[in-house]
């Protein structure tokens, strides 16, 4: 799997439990999946499905969040990407898996219509 995004979890993204809001992490997973699609084949992609999503452990303020991605499947117009978010806690611990997901993206043209993915 490829490291697609690294970002620090900041206090302004906390929820009522004083952990990082799941929607913040979800948006970064979505962006990391797009990075994987663009690295696989340049073009414009739209997220069409979150096929699987599992929050394993909480993310805390100060954690360094690293999102790893890998292509699971390439279809005629779509790419399915496996995503794994891991963190390094502020105490310098080893990477801990916090979230896993499987997202599907469709390649589109300028009119947002599906476009065939060329086999490389």
Model-derived regions: residue spans:
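Short, well-ordered turn and helix-capping elements at secondary-structure junctions
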Residues: 11-13, 50-57, 87-89
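Hydrophobic beta-strand-centered segment that forms part of the acyl-chain substrate-binding groove
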Residues: 34-68, 72-74, 78-80, 96-101
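HotDog/MaoC-like acyl-thioester-processing domains
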Residues: 1-5, 60-61, 72-120
């Amino acid at each position: 799997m490829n490291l697609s995004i690294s970002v620090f979890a900041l206090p302004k993204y906390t929820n009522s439990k004083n952990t990082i809001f799941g929607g913040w992490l979800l948006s970064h997973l979505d962006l990391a999946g797009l990075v994987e699609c663009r690295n696989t084949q340049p073009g414009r992609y739209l997220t069409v499905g979150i096929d699987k999503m599992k929050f394993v452990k909480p993310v805390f303020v100060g954690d360094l969040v690293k999102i790893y991605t890998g292509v699971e499947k390439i279809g005629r117009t779509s790419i399915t990407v496996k995503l794994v978010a891991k963190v390094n806690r502020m105490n310098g611990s080893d990477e801990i898996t916090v979230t896993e997901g499987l997202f599907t993206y469709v390649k589109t043209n300028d009119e947002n219509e599906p476009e065939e993915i060329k086999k490389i």
